[in-house]
Amino acid sequence: MELVKVVFMGWFKNESMFTKEITMMKDDVQWATTQYAEVNKALVKAFIDDKKVCEVDCRG
């Protein structure tokens, strides 16, 4: 199990933005990205070492 520092960047329908930086298990990044997107009804992108590793859009 590998710990990584992940930066989540999210955009709401009204174009406002949020960021969150956490250290977590690499295997959980996709799940966490989906949760942030669903809960916030936002487009969320996850970055590890400045590389986008996943993206989920729940702005509907």
Curated annotation (Swiss-Prot):
Antitoxin component of a potential type II toxin-antitoxin (TA) system. Acts as an antitoxin against host toxins RnlA and LsoA, preventing them from degrading T4 bacteriophage-derived mRNA and thus permitting successful virus infection. Stabilizes middle (8-10 minutes) and late (18 to 28 minutes) T4 gene transcripts. Pfam families: Dmd (PF17587). Disruption phenotype: Phage grows very poorly in wild-type E.coli K12 or in cells expressing plasmid-derived toxin-antitoxin system LsoA-LsoB; if the host has a deletion in rnlA-rnlB no effect is seen. Absence of full-length transcripts of late (18 to 28 minutes) T4 genes, and thus loss of synthesis of late proteins. Partially suppressed by overexpression of host IscR. This is Antitoxin Dmd. Keywords: Evasion of bacteria-mediated translation shutoff by virus, Host-virus interaction, Toxin-antitoxin system. Can form a complex with non-cognate host toxins LsoA and RnlA. InterPro entries: Dmd. It comes from Enterobacteria phage T4.
